[in-house]
Amino acid sequence: MPSTIRLEVVTPEKVVFSEPVNILIAPAIDGEIGILPKHTPLVTGLKTGVMRVKKDGEEVKISISEGFMEVKPDEINVIVRTAELPHEIDVERARDALKRAEKRLNSRNDRIDRARARAAFERAIARLKAAGHY
């Protein structure tokens, strides 16, 4: 059995990650899912969170927003709205976004779009977790 599977993470703007990996753990809509080489083909929705990629004993965290994942026995294609590697994340900006989202979620103003505030909150948490600051 091969010890790696090709992972490609793409957004509308760019290819964020494209390398062979040993395992991918991703935030699927029904819970975390782990993908190893030679996995059964599948397509699943992804929710905002942190993907963990293990390669040669190292772990890389990638902050993602919602999207989809297509798995084939020899490759994984992840298509998401946004994705960031830890070194790309502006931690202060993510902290500020978290504070703003918390403030909106705690507001009693009926004009606040709670779904958007919740999405912003989840994105900020994912970014901080991927950067190792949450």
Curated annotation (Swiss-Prot):
GO molecular function, one term: ATP binding
Residues making up the signal peptide according to the UniProt record: none
Subunit structure: F-type ATPases have 2 components, CF(1) - the catalytic core - and CF(0) - the membrane proton channel. CF(1) has five subunits: alpha(3), beta(3), gamma(1), delta(1), epsilon(1). CF(0) has three main subunits: a, b and c.
Membrane topology: Peripheral membrane protein
Protein name: ATP synthase epsilon chain
InterPro entries listed in its UniProt record: ATP_F1_dsu/esu_C_sf, ATP_synth_F1_dsu/esu, ATP_synth_F1_dsu/esu_N, ATP_synth_F1_esu_C, ATPsynth_dsu/esu_N
Function: Produces ATP from ADP in the presence of a proton gradient across the membrane.
Cellular component terms per the entry's GO annotation: plasma membrane; proton-transporting ATP synthase complex
PANTHER family to which the protein is assigned, alphabetical: ATP SYNTHASE DELTA/EPSILON CHAIN, ATP SYNTHASE EPSILON CHAIN, CHLOROPLASTIC
Cross-referenced HAMAP family: ATP_synth_epsil_bac
Location(s) in or outside the cell: Cell inner membrane
Keywords: ATP synthesis, Cell inner membrane, Cell membrane, CF(1), Hydrogen ion transport, Ion transport, Membrane, Transport
Family (UniProt): Belongs to the ATPase epsilon chain family.
